[in-house]
């Protein structure tokens, strides 16, 4: 007799983070996988410590819903910068130092009252840039190389920026941002920070009524040429390339927007319904799109080595958004309106896992970095004492802290945010 195949039990989340009182719209794992940042439909931001699963900072960043949120650490991991995009038509940059964390509010939105909100201490608002937020398309950002960054001895910033920046001579991290154009919802604007200046506009396609821009992604080629992938309301996806490397002249006030010559290098009607999200894996020369229809499509990026072919799969499950490719390019995940998170193979597009826990639709997912080399000293949690090396056999608090950090950093986290306001953390693949 043949032995019946034993079915593996369904996957279950490792942790559930409960803190938001409204749907989760943005997630990002950063700080060497030690921090998770989340944003919700009421404009609240929470920075979570993934070691202790507790909030590090909580504040209301926008009066409207959060469209996207990103977090980064600088200055030997002692300074955190948070980039938020809200439905109040603002793109904000927030900053706090490791020594400020004890002073920041930690009361979660589900527990907060209006009185506590008025007395709350929030991070420094470094920049507030007016941008379009009418069509639910979140920003995409790209840090510039040092040789591309203009000299901003006197950066153009708001008065609020100059009075609230923590520390003396805070570092200026030059970056580009792509957002939909304010006048033509099918066009794309490129902004520069810290100059807070619009550099150019990629006009809407004149031959096709694509409708609104639904998603954008900025990325570099191997030769450091700037590319942007975009997805549209009618199901089209496109890729534009800016030929030649960027120079400081391109960011100076003397350069006009006409000096930015964009070339459309790829266009495809990939979906029958609005394309909801895209993500690019430059090292592999491809990007993935998901839509309100049931298709998941893998597209080649012309100019990235050998040009591949378009691959698509009918998943039988409509409404998958928030697509994210993991840093090693092996798997990607989508957030489903049916409350499921699905994990696919980047190579074959085969469905590898269906993660079911949430009772309501999921809107966003985030992967941990599985390829980075991490320094798990105490400085990663804002305490420099843990960076010291203990002798063999010596037991100390620093050793325990370092071991905890290493365990979290090496975990293949997948975070999912749902309409129910909860964040599920999964350890997969």
From Swiss-Prot:
It is found in: Nucleus. The keyword Calcium does not apply. Its main location: nucleus. The keyword Ribosomal protein does not apply. It comes from the Eukaryota. One of its GO terms (biological process) is chromatin organization. Pfam families: WD40. Belongs to the WD repeat ASA1 family. Component of the ASTRA chromatin remodeling machinery complex. Component of the ASTRA complex involved in chromatin remodeling. This is ASTRA-associated protein 1. The gene is asa1.
